[in-house]
Structures are given as structure tokens and as C-alpha cells.
Amino acid sequence: MELVQQLIADYGYLAIFLMLVLGIVGLPIPDEVMMTVVGYFTHTDVLNYELSILISFVGALLGMLISYMIGRKAGRPFIDKYGKWVGLKEKRMMKVEKWMKKYGPYSLILGYFIPGVRHVTCYFSGIGKMDLKTYVAFAAIGAFLWCFVFITIGRVIGIIHV
């Protein structure tokens, strides 16, 4: 938590952007905590509220797009080769692909709010070759809502705390 605060204090919007891109791709970065801190900093006028939402949105969406592309280009061969080590055998992959075809776009929106799920929905969307325009549209809706909610929570905490 202190490291997140220090990075934001030292590098501002660049730190927010990079932490979200890398966190969405899969590095262990506490995204929700980070955005709540960002929201708090918007209350204390260290950061601008609207710009923080915009930068967070762009970082989250870029991270989702990178993950989608990795899933689309390398996902299926990687799963075929190494999936058995993490419980993703052919039968389970077929279930996942069927589920993603049916609920995939909506899982992108809901998945943002479930830690761990947002990280895999993007890869599985790419593996399942979801249409890129559909993917970007639903990922963008989810990214905006997710960033807005957590940054606003942090801002409200700042207002209540004072």
C-alpha cells in the first residue's frame, strides 16, 4: 500500500497508467487498492478526478487489449501444451470456450469487479477469437465503470475522512 502511494506521489498519472496496464496483463498489482488511493488523492487535490478516471480507463483498456492479443495469438497453443498442468484439459477448455461464446461480452463487464476473473476473461476472449470490435466495446464499458466506481469510492472516503 505504501509503495503504491509513493509511486503515485512520485510519478502521478504515469504510475497510474503503467500499474493498470501491467496489473490487467497479470502482474500482482492491487488494482482496486491503487484506484481507491487515486480517488483519495483526487479529494486532496494531488490528482484531478476526471483526468484520473480517464488515465485509469485508458490504462485498463490497453491492458485488456494486450491480454486479448496475447490470448488470440499464443493462447490456444500455449493451453494445449501447458494447460494440463493447471487443470485446463481439452474438455474443460471446450466448456470455457462455449461459455465465453454465450456470455463472453457480459463477462468482460462483470469480470472487472471480480479479482482474478478480469485477468482471464481477456485471455479467453482472445483464445475464443471474440470479434475485436465487440471485445473493445464491452471491455471499454467495463473499464470505465470499474475505474469510475473505485476512484469515486476513494474520493468519497477522502470526503468522509476529513
From Swiss-Prot:
Keywords: Cell membrane, Membrane, Transmembrane, Transmembrane helix. InterPro entries: DedA_domain (IPR051311), VTT_dom (IPR032816). It is a multi-pass membrane protein. Pfam families: VTT_dom. It is found in: Cell membrane. The keyword Transmembrane helix applies. The chain crosses the membrane at residues 7-27, 51-71, 134-154. Coiled coil: none annotated. GO terms for cellular component: plasma membrane. Its main location: membrane. It comes from the Bacteria. Belongs to the DedA family. This is Uncharacterized membrane protein YbfM. The gene is ybfM.
